[in-house]
Amino acid sequence: MIKFRLNGKIFELENDISVYDFLAQNGYELKFIALERDGEILPKKLWHEHFMSEAKDYEIVTLVGGG
C-alpha cells in the first residue's frame, strides 16, 4: 500500500500509479496546475515517468490570472 499526502489530505493506493494518471483520474485540469513534491516543483514532462511515492508530501499549485 502506498500512502502519501496531497494538499493536506492522506491518500492510500493499492497499486503504483504515475503522477499524470493519478491527477487525471482525480479530475484535475492538468493544463492549469503545477505539482510540488516535498517542496520542489516536479516538471510536467516528468509526470508520466514518476510515480506517486510513499511518505511524500504533494501540493497542487494553480495558476491565477490577474490584471
Model-derived features: positions:
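Ubiquitin-like/PB1-type beta-grasp interaction modules and other compact soluble beta-rich domains
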Residues: 1-66
